[in-house]
């Protein structure tokens, strides 16, 4: 996609995440939280629902800081000024388990990922951009799958692009079931 073009087309958008978003999204949220904390400590900050504040935010300047000053150190972003540093691929085992509280997911399909990437080189597909597969640690996968079993989850949908391309990893999961 054309990140800079999208930002020109939609000037109210501050930036676009590029690549995997879990870590980048968290860091962007942390920046917004720091700004909210600072705004709460400042008596000069306009009310959050005021037109003046909304216009200032659309321009990307908050508390006198530009978008680059606010977000330029966060890897994996496209800003109007250009791209920040590329984000390294995330170790899948470090990603948090999203289903510890199953209440919101009662009678729903659970989406679960044990790997990312693709070893193939299909020209039409984005899944093979880096031509490698990353696996979530099998002991973590088994622990999380056991949680689903203990919670009597009716359906888990594996969303791995190429679940069975690492035969050993896939067979470990099948044997576990």
Predicted segments with their positions:
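Radical SAM [4Fe-4S] cluster-binding motif and immediate context
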Residues: 63, 96-177
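Radical SAM enzyme [4Fe-4S]-AdoMet core and its adjacent flexible, acidic
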Residues: 8, 89, 173-174
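Generic intrinsically disordered, low-complexity segments enriched for polar/acidic and small residues
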Residues: 7, 22, 29, 50, ...
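Pocket-edge positions in alpha/beta enzyme catalytic cores
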Residues: 17, 84-87, 131-133, 162
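Short, solvent-exposed loop/turn segments at secondary-structure junctions
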Residues: 1, 21-24, 89-91, 119, ...
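N-terminal [4Fe-4S]-dependent radical SAM core
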Residues: 71-114
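Glycine-rich beta-alpha loop elements in corrinoid/cobalamin-binding modules
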Residues: 1-53, 57-86
């Amino acid at each position: 996609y054309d990140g800079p073009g999208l930002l020109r087309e939609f000037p109210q958008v501050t930036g676009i995440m590029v690549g995997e978003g879990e870590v980048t999204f968290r860091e962007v949220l942390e920046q917004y939280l720091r700004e909210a904390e600072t705004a709460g400590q400042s008596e000069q900050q306009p009310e959050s629902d005021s037109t003046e504040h909304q216009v200032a935010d659309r321009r990307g300047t908050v508390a006198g800081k530009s978008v680059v000053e606010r977000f330029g150190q966060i890897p994996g972003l496209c800003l109007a000024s250009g791209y920040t540093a590329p984000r390294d691929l995330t170790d899948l085992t470090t990603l948090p388990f999203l289903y510890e509280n199953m209440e919101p997911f009662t009678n729903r399909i659970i989406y679960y990922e044990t790997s990312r990437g693709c070893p193939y080189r299909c020209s039409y597909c984005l899944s093979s951009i880096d031509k490698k597969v990353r696996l979530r640690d099998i002991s973590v996968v088994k622990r999380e799958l056991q949680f689903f079993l203990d919670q009597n989850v009716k359906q888990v949908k594996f969303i791995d692009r190429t679940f069975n391309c690492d035969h050993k990893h896939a067979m470990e999961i099948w044997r576990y079931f």
